[in-house]
């Protein structure tokens, strides 16, 4: 983790918020947004917030000062963006339910269809809306450098995007104004630079008839060490080659919220079975499912690897899932019931994926404003939230 992030988190008072709680540092969030805005200024590209990664709409007014709009994965995300985030509203889905499209065309600005057949099916609905909606198609260049197959949109047999052999010719894309590719996950500008030639090799004949190209998400633009200069030069070179009339879009989700917040949790009990096990009021399964899906071991403020410090514990969640385990950590001081912990970098792909498995309470949502020192609890969850999603 970057020194800037650690210093900011160390200054937080964990006792000022409920437990468990997602706590967003608004100063860090704004720093990320400024980096993204600088890319827009240097390249003319437009950067959209991908709501699938971060959708805490209480922070949309801040983010909207810097970004050009939102991109959604379906009707409900699109509605959230339309309601709370000024700017462009984009939507893509692997397959749109027929009932959703008449709703979407009432307010979205861009629709990316996954296949020519989806475009042909809903083309008349778009036209009947009477609104200017720019439509495109997601394509699959069949090239990616994603390490984890579960996150690889170009894996063999992927449903995400149309491969070149499934497009009969330019006439199949008649009426479409954009090409959308998403091939990356937590990667640098060098990967985009290596991917674009594969995109051009397969889809160059269609580019001249387009008004925009969307390079998708997975761009780790706010990660320390990310080569922003290379990203900008890559975008500018593409526009120089294919025409400055082409609007370029990027739609990161993680890059907006990367290293902006923590998950505050509390030790409930310590049990022993071969080693001390600290049971927390949070859950890997319900509150941070990527730790099990990827899997990965989240960092914790002040903690080290097993055996690094004097006191080693296995940290586990409070659900009945035997594998609801966060990992093994060591601490300079013993943990006791009531000890509060800060799991680092827990803003993205957490709130949007939380569940109430076992009836476990969803973490509260709070923010910290460094300019004033204010802690604001935005939302607490309870029994009604659990009950209402079940009937």
Q: Which residues does each predicted region cover?
A:
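Active-site-proximal beta-alpha core segment in soluble small-molecule metabolic enzymes
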Residues: 45-212, 226, 241
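Charged (often Lys/Glu-rich) extended helix/loop segments that serve as interaction or gating elements
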Residues: 247-391
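N-terminal capping/small domains of soluble enzymes
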Residues: 6-86, 92-96, 283, 331-344, ...
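Glycine-rich beta-strand-to-loop/alpha-helix junction loops that act as flexible
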Residues: 183-184, 213-222, 252-255
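Acidic/histidine-enriched ion/cofactor-binding microenvironments in catalytic or ligand-binding pockets
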Residues: 201, 207-210, 230-237, 241-243, ...
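Short glycine/threonine-rich loop-to-helix capping motif typified by GTGT followed
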Residues: 188-194, 222-232, 258-269, 328-331
